[in-house]
Amino acid sequence: MQKLLLAVLFFSLLAIATARPKYHKQGRRKGDACRLHCLFDNIVCETPCRVLFRSRFSYHVCARDCRKDRVDCYIGCKNIDANPKAEAEPGSLDKEAGTKGEKEKNGKKEKKEKKEKGEYAIGNAESGTGSSGGSNKTHDDDDDDHDDVYENDDENEE
């Protein structure tokens, strides 16, 4: 029993000390960053179960809550993908920076500054050629929900 408590304490401290990766600052879309956060949280949650329980049944009982949390997290990420207009501009961190017109003006200014400094990530779908105005949409999306823009053919082949 003492070993179990020490192991739980150890993994709790490890989970607290482990910094969650900042996927949204790596140039990823909000939906993708959300799914990666769900995956990271699931791994941190299930690791003590894998280490502590040797039998398959005990492991599944331990990991059941982690899996429920992961499913709920993915459902929340689908809501983020369904409401792309609620997302902030790629350069701004706060969602309520002003009116839509102010955001567009600020986004274009920030984009020009970042382009001059070369701060865009390679392979970022939003970097494009600079003519997209900070959006990864290339055409009217009334007919489909696909917003992905691929910059090279290697990413299209899976």
Swiss-Prot record:
Q: Which UniProt keywords apply?
A: Secreted, Signal
Q: Where is the composition biased (Basic and acidic residues)?
A: 84-107
* Tissue expression notes: Prismatic layer of shell (at protein level). Expressed primarily in the mantle with highest level in the mantle edge and lower level in the mantle pallium.
Q: Where is the composition biased (Acidic residues)?
A: 141-158
One GO cellular component, as annotated? extracellular region
- Region feature (Disordered): 82-158
Which residues belong to the signal peptide in this entry?
A: 1-19
- Report the domain of life of the source organism: Eukaryota
The protein's location, in the record's own words, is: Secreted
Protein known as: Uncharacterized shell protein 1
According to its UniProt entry, this protein's organism is Pinctada maxima (Silver-lipped pearl oyster)
